């Protein structure tokens, strides 16, 4: 009888330990997912901020009438002619205005 009671106590401890391990695994999974999403959001925010900076520098170039502006590592080129206006960041065309 004593052996049976001792076995039940060990079984209860084992079940509690198993539940704790499962809970820890679930917590670790949730934490990993959250941290991954936070990292992804930060990367997206950095891309958005970079695009905003490019557009700000392009706006400055247009407002000042300069053909080339380089600020904070962002280089903008403005090509204007009688037919229209084009604004570039590297090889990417940001704006194109042409007369009909």
UniProtKB/Swiss-Prot annotation:
Keywords: Cell membrane, Membrane, Transmembrane, Transmembrane helix. The keyword Mitochondrion does not apply. It holds the Pfam family ComGE. It is a single-pass membrane protein. The chain crosses the membrane at residues 15-35. It comes from the Bacteria. It is found in: Cell membrane; Cell surface. Its main location: membrane. Induction: Part of the putative comGA-comGB-comGC-comGD-comGE-comGF-comGG operon. InterPro entries: ComGE, T4P_transformation_protein. The keyword Membrane applies. GO terms for cellular component: cell surface; plasma membrane. The transformation pili are flexible filaments, consisting mainly of the major pilin ComGC and smaller amounts of the minor pilins, including at least ComGD, ComGF and ComGG, and perhaps ComGE. Interacts with ComGD. Interacts with ComGF. Interacts with ComGG. NCBIfam families: T4P_ComGE (NF041013). Required for formation of the type IV-like pilus (T4P) that plays a role in transformation. Transformation pili are dynamically extended and retracted, perhaps thereby promoting DNA uptake and transformation. Involved in transformation. Required for DNA binding. This is Competence protein ComGE. The gene is comGE.
